[in-house]
UniProtKB/Swiss-Prot annotation:
Organism annotation: Molineria latifolia (Lumbah)
Signal peptide: 1-22
SUPFAM superfamilies listed in its UniProt record: alpha-D-mannose-specific plant lectins
Record protein name field: Curculin-1
Domain Bulb-type lectin: start-end pairs: 23-131
Functional summary from the UniProt entry: Taste-modifying protein; sweet-tasting. After curculin, water elicits a sweet taste, and sour substances induce a stronger sense of sweetness.
Gene3D superfamilies: Bulb-type lectin domain
Residue stretch(es) of the prosequence: 137-158
Length: 158
């Protein structure tokens, strides 16, 4: 199950990288400018000109960053460290996800279930010889009773 999920994410990244920005994806280094949106099914994520990031379901507001009127000409940018930041027209940060990691390739995905999630580099993976460090992560010992599967990988989003 986890392997299929990871494969789906990897295929999505590959498709988006080759085609440019999808309607529901913002890649690291990309910016969503004022009054533009990501769209997935019934959900829309919009960065408003006055700096409010708002999620709508079927046109009805269901979440907001509560940063309305903290600037103008605002934009939403996914940084190369995975931090999602709202900047005003003077490049002042108005709001941030306050979650970041090592520099890498990240993707903000507005999913069809309405969640918006930042995906990024694998922090660790379990190979046939146990777990090994990835990106300076924690070394985790493999339980001897656990089956060995090269295809098990875990991404931790804090």
């Amino acid at each position: 199950m986890a392997a299929k999920f990871l494969l789906t994410i990897l295929v999505t990244f590959a498709a988006v990288a080759s085609l440019g920005m999808a309607d529901n994806v913002l890649l690291s280094g990309q910016t969503l400018h004022a009054d533009h949106s990501l769209q997935a099914g019934a959900y829309t994520l919009t960065i408003q000109n006055k700096c409010n990031l708002v999620k709508y379901q079927n046109g009805r507001q269901i979440w907001a960053s509560n940063t309305d009127r903290r600037g103008s000409g605002c934009r939403l940018t996914l940084l190369s460290d995975g931090n999602l930041v709202i900047y005003d027209h003077n490049n002042n940060d108005v709001w941030g996800s306050a979650c970041w990691g090592d520099n890498g390739k990240y993707a903000l995905v507005l999913q069809k279930d309405g969640r918006f999630v930042i995906y990024g580099p694998v922090l660790w993976s379990l190979g046939p010889n146990g777990c090994r460090r990835v990106n300076g992560g924690i070394t985790v010992a493999k339980d001897s009773t656990e089956p060995q599967h090269e295809d098990i990988k875990m991404v931790i989003n804090n």
